[in-house]
């Protein structure tokens, strides 16, 4: 959504303040764009409890000077108004308004080795400061963007070593695969595919077994075949969850697999309905045929387009 405001200066002046919204039901607001059905029941209850115990700040808030001179004069909280262009500028790895001598425009996510030893520490600090920071969840590439290329020299060798499931955690496996993916794709800028979220969901469900997929598995499928979503803002996840809940092309089915510890359903899965299969054949495949070249440019493996879309 692109809002065009007449009095922009007034709204910009509210950055870092709590002028209103104290009567806002933040508990319900936070869970509207969130997906928790892929989590265990205990984790869902704990997340709702943590939000439920939060209370809005008392007014008026006590102003205090920021220690670093860059933060707001009040204690940060969920009810604070902020300018997202200042907190997390999109499409740029630089600060929105750098000072005169500290222009970070040409600094890349991977720092180059300095010519002099004296400026090594200063160079690293500038690179870290140039990365956008946010309280929301960052993508894997953003989290690992401050590493130097030398950190990834042995990644391919590590990936080829046999995995011991008893010694290696799932988080470690995921981390290694993401590092390897980053090496192969760090120099390429991916474009957004000409497909909406309902097409992406149908594509993921159509190319997986009939038992269905969880929400997290749909996310993983989308990022695996369309790398644009590795670095895209997390809003696309909320759109996928919205489409799953409100379109008649998808239905939720209970997972038949049981957890061995407490014998409960692991999570809910999603499947294509008859209407979903019809739309895949009449809409998604037709769009893929018409936009074949553009879609292939956005895919990590363009040769799979024919099999994925059943062309």
Curated annotation (Swiss-Prot):
Region (Disordered): 56-76, 90-171
Gene3D superfamilies: Winged helix-like DNA-binding domain superfamily/Winged helix DNA-binding domain (1.10.10.10)
Known DNA-binding region: 192-294
Pfam family, one: Forkhead
CDD domains in the cross-refs: FH_FOXR
Expression sites by tissue: Expressed in breast cancer cell lines and primary cancer.
Cellular compartments per GO CC: chromatin; nucleoplasm; nucleus
Basic and acidic residues bias: start-end ranges: 115-128
Key words of the record: DNA-binding, Nucleus, Transcription, Transcription regulation
Comp. bias (Acidic residues): 153-164
Protein name: Forkhead box protein R2
Gene source species: Homo sapiens
């Amino acid at each position: 959504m692109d809002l065009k405001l007449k009095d922009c200066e007034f709204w910009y002046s509210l950055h870092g303040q709590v002028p209103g919204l104290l009567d806002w039901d933040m508990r319900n607001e936070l869970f509207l764009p969130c997906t928790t059905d892929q989590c265990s029941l205990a984790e869902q209850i704990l997340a709702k409890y943590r939000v439920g115990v939060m209370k809005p700040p008392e007014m008026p808030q006590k102003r205090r000077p920021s220690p670093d001179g860059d933060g707001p004069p009040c204690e940060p909280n969920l009810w604070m108004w902020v300018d997202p262009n200042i907190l997390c500028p999109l499409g740029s790895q630089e600060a929105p308004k750098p000072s005169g001598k500290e222009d970070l425009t040409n600094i890349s996510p991977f720092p180059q080795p300095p010519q002099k030893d004296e400026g090594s520490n200063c160079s690293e600090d500038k690179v870290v400061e140039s990365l956008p920071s946010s309280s929301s969840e960052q993508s894997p590439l953003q989290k690992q963007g401050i590493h130097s290329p030398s950190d990834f020299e042995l990644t391919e060798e590590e990936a080829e070593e046999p995995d011991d499931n008893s010694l290696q955690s799932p988080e470690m496996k995921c981390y290694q695969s993401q590092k390897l993916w980053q090496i192969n794709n760090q120099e390429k800028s991916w474009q957004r595919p000409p497909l909406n979220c309902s097409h992406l969901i149908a594509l993921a469900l159509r190319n997986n077994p009939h038992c269905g997929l969880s929400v997290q598995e749909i996310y993983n499928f989308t990022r695996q075949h369309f790398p644009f979503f590795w670095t895209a803002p997390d809003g696309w996840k909320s759109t996928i969850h919205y489409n799953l809940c409100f379109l008649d092309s998808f239905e939720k089915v209970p997972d038949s697999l049981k957890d061995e510890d407490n014998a409960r359903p692991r999570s809910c899965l999603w499947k294509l309905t008859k209407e979903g299969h019809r739309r895949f054949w009449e809409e998604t495949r037709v769009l893929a045929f018409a936009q074949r070249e553009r879609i292939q440019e956005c895919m990590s493996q363009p040769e799979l387009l024919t099999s994925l879309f059943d062309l």
